[in-house]
Structure formats: C-alpha cells, structure tokens
C-alpha cells in the first residue's frame, strides 16, 4: 500500500514538473527570439489553452491528487484480501496441506490417520 502511494506521489510530482516545463516553454515561444524549433514544440502536443489552465490551477490539481491518493489507499485495502487468499492457496497447493482453523469441521476421520506416536520432551527441557 505504501509503495503504491509512493509511486503515485512520484508520478504526480514528475507530471507537475513536466507540465511546469511545458508552461515555461509555451511562454518562451510567445516571446520573440525564443530560439525553439518546431520539433521542440511538438514534444507536448497539448493545446495551449489546456496548458494555461493546468498551470493556473495548481490548487485544483493538488486537490485532485489528494482525492486520487485517498481512492488508491481505499482500493489497496480492498484488493489486498483476495491477493493474500490467492497467495495462501498457491502455497497450500505447493505444500500439499492446509491449515485447519479453529471452529471449522475437519474432513475425514482422524482415527484412521497415521500417527507418528507421541513425543515427550525430557524433563530437563521443560
């Protein structure tokens, strides 16, 4: 869950940094003598009105980021239970046995199960 939040935060920061660079480039292109070619301007194929709106509304994007992070944390909690169950079933299949939880009936007859005998610890160990 923390790694997901960290990834989203890094992604948001890098996106904000790249949008800030795009806003600076678009403002430099508006000024004469910017020295940028058309190839540089094609790197960001967003309309200039959208770039201006994104650059001017930093608080809205932060609110959206916080909402997205809260949704991601809620989604991570919900999806972690099935993933744990799947991993448990995978390892149970590898081991060939299943943990018996208290309060659940046991399939099969335990009287017919082979036993290894009773092992008693020497008195010095206890």
Swiss-Prot record:
Residues 101-126 are annotated as: Disordered. InterPro entries: Neurokinin-B/TAC3, Tachy_Neuro_lke_CS. Its main location: secreted. Residues 21-83, 99-126 form a propeptide. Residues 1-20 form the signal peptide. It is found in: Secreted. Keywords: Amidation, Cleavage on pair of basic residues, Neuropeptide, Secreted, Signal. Tachykinins are active peptides which excite neurons, evoke behavioral responses, are potent vasodilators and secretagogues, and contract (directly or indirectly) many smooth muscles. Is a critical central regulator of gonadal function. This is Neurokinin-B. The lineage of its organism: Eukaryota, Metazoa, Chordata, Craniata, Vertebrata.
């Amino acid at each position: 869950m923390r790694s997901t939040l960290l990834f989203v935060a890094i992604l948001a920061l890098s996106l904000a940094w790249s949008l800030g660079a795009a806003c600076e480039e678009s403002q430099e292109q508006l000024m004469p003598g910017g020295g940028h070619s058309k190839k540089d301007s094609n790197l960001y194929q967003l309309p200039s009105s959208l770039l201006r709106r994104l650059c001017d509304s930093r608080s809205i994007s932060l609110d959206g980021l916080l909402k997205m992070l809260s949704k991601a944390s809620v989604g991570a909690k919900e999806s972690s239970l099935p993933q744990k169950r799947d991993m448990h079933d995978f390892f149970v299949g590898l081991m060939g046995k299943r943990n018996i939880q208290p309060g659940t009936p046991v399939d099969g007859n335990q009287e017919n199960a082979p036993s290894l005998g009773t092992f008693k610890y020497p008195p010095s160990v206890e």
